Amino acid sequence: MEDIRVLIVDDSALMRNLIGKIVDATPGLKIADKAMNGRFALQKLERVAPDVIVLDLEMPEMNGIEFLRELKKQNIKIPVVILSSIAKEGAKVTMDCLELGACDFITKPSGSESANLTTVSETLSKMLLAYGRRHQIETGTRSTDTTNSFSEPFKSTIPKPMTAAEPQKEEKPTPQREHGNIQIIAIGISTGGPNALRQVFASIDKDLPQPIVVVQHMPPGFTKEFALSLDKICPLEVKEAEDGDLIKPGRILIAPGGKHLVVEKRSLAAVAKVIDTEPQSGHKPSVDVLFGSVAKEYQNHALGIIMTGMGKDGAENITKLYTEGSRTIGQDEGSSVVYGMPRVAWEMGGVMEQVSLDNMAAAINRYGKEFA
C-alpha cells in the first residue's frame, strides 16, 4: 500500500515546516507539497494529487473558507482537515468549513504554545492516516484493500493492514433483564463524527419518541457552534447541553467541550447534568461517563450507539448498557473513518448489531418507534 500524500496549506513558513516534520515522522505519510495559501494550493492539486489536505483558515489571497468553496464548486473530493485557532470566532469559521465539506478539524495550541504542535501531533497523524487511506480506497488509486476504515490502534511503527475486527468474545456478557421500551437514545462518537452526525441527524424523524444525548469528542469553545450547525439541518432541536436542561422528546443535547454530560431522572422529568470532574478514558467529555449514567438511570430502557472514533472510550459502558438490558448498536467497520471505539465495543460483546453510516438514521428511527 502506497504512502498517503499530504498537501500542507498554511501561510506561515514555520507552521508548514512543523506540520511537515509531523508528516515525515509518521510511517505511511509523505509530503505531496506545501502551499502558502488556497490559490497556490488549487494550482498544485492536479499535479501533486494529494490524498488528504491540511488547511489553515486565515491566509492571504485565498483563505480556508474560500478554498473549500472552490473545491465544492469544482466538485473536487479530497478530504480536508482544518487546523483551527481556539478563539471563539475560530469555532464559527470551523463549523462553516465542516458545512462546506471539510472532514474534521484539530485545534492549534494557543499563545506561547502556538509553535508547539507536538501536543496534537499524534491526533493529527492519525487523522491524516485515516482520512487519506479512506480516500485512496474510495478512489481506487493506490490500494486494493477492501476495507474503508482505519483500524485502531497501531501496534508497531510499520503501517498495519486495515484488518477486520476480532470476533466477539465466546463468553458474551449476559443481559441481567429483558429489553424494556426505549426511553432515551445515547450516542458516543469521535474522529469522523462531525460529518457522520450531520448525515444522521439530517434524516432523523421529527416525531422520534425519544430524546437523544450525545458525546462528540471536541474541545471547549466548539460544541456550541457545532450544535447550532446541526440544528440548521435536523428536524429536532439540537443544542449544547447546559446544567439542568430538560431531557425530552424532540431535543438532542450535545455534551459541552471540556465537561462531562450525565443524565439524572427525577420524579417528574429527566435532566442533564454538566459536571467538571477528571477526564475518563482519556477524554472530557467522555462517552463512558455518559453511557455509565444512562445505564444507571435507565437500565434496560435505553438505546446506546457507539460510532466512529479512535481508542476505546465508550466501549466499557456500552457493554454495561447491554448487560443492564438496553439495546445497543455499533457503527460498522466499512463506514467508520476510524474503527476504534466501535471495534473494541464489538469485541467486548457490548454491541448487538453493527450498522453502516448510511443506514444509521433509519436504524435509529426504526428502533425508536418500534420499541417506544
From Swiss-Prot:
Primary residence: cytoplasm
Name assigned to this protein: Protein-glutamate methylesterase/protein-glutamine glutaminase
Biased segments, Basic and acidic residues type: 167-177
Catalysis: reaction(s): [protein]-L-glutamate 5-O-methyl ester + H2O = L-glutamyl-[protein] + methanol + H(+); L-glutaminyl-[protein] + H2O = L-glutamyl-[protein] + NH4(+)
Annotated CheB-type methylesterase domain residues: 178-364
Gene Ontology BP, a term: chemotaxis
Record EC number: 3.1.1.61, 3.5.1.44
A Pfam family that the UniProt record links to this protein: Response_reg
Record organism: Treponema denticola (strain ATCC 35405 / DSM 14222 / CIP 103919 / JCM 8153 / KCTC 15104)
Membership in a protein family: Belongs to the CheB family.
Domain Response regulatory: residue ranges: 5-123
Record-linked SUPFAM superfamilies: CheY-like, Methylesterase CheB, C-terminal domain
Domain text: Contains a C-terminal catalytic domain, and an N-terminal region which modulates catalytic activity.
Region entry Disordered, spans: 140-177
Positions of modified residues (4-aspartylphosphate): 56
Biased composition (Polar residues): 140-151
HAMAP family reported for this sequence: CheB_chemtxs
Function field: Involved in chemotaxis. Part of a chemotaxis signal transduction system that modulates chemotaxis in response to various stimuli. Catalyzes the demethylation of specific methylglutamate residues introduced into the chemoreceptors (methyl-accepting chemotaxis proteins or MCP) by CheR. Also mediates the irreversible deamidation of specific glutamine residues to glutamic acid.
Compartment annotation: Cytoplasm
InterPro entries to which the protein is assigned, alphabetical: CheB-like, CheB_C, CheY-like_superfamily, Sig_transdc_resp-reg_Me-estase, Sig_transdc_resp-reg_receiver
PTM statement from Swiss-Prot or TrEMBL: Phosphorylated by CheA. Phosphorylation of the N-terminal regulatory domain activates the methylesterase activity.
Domain of life: Bacteria
CDD domains, A to Z: CheB_Rec, REC_CheB-like
GO cellular component: cytoplasm
GO molecular function: phosphorelay response regulator activity; protein-glutamate methylesterase activity; protein-glutamine glutaminase activity
Signal sequence extent: none
Organism lineage: Bacteria, Pseudomonadati, Spirochaetota, Spirochaetia, Spirochaetales
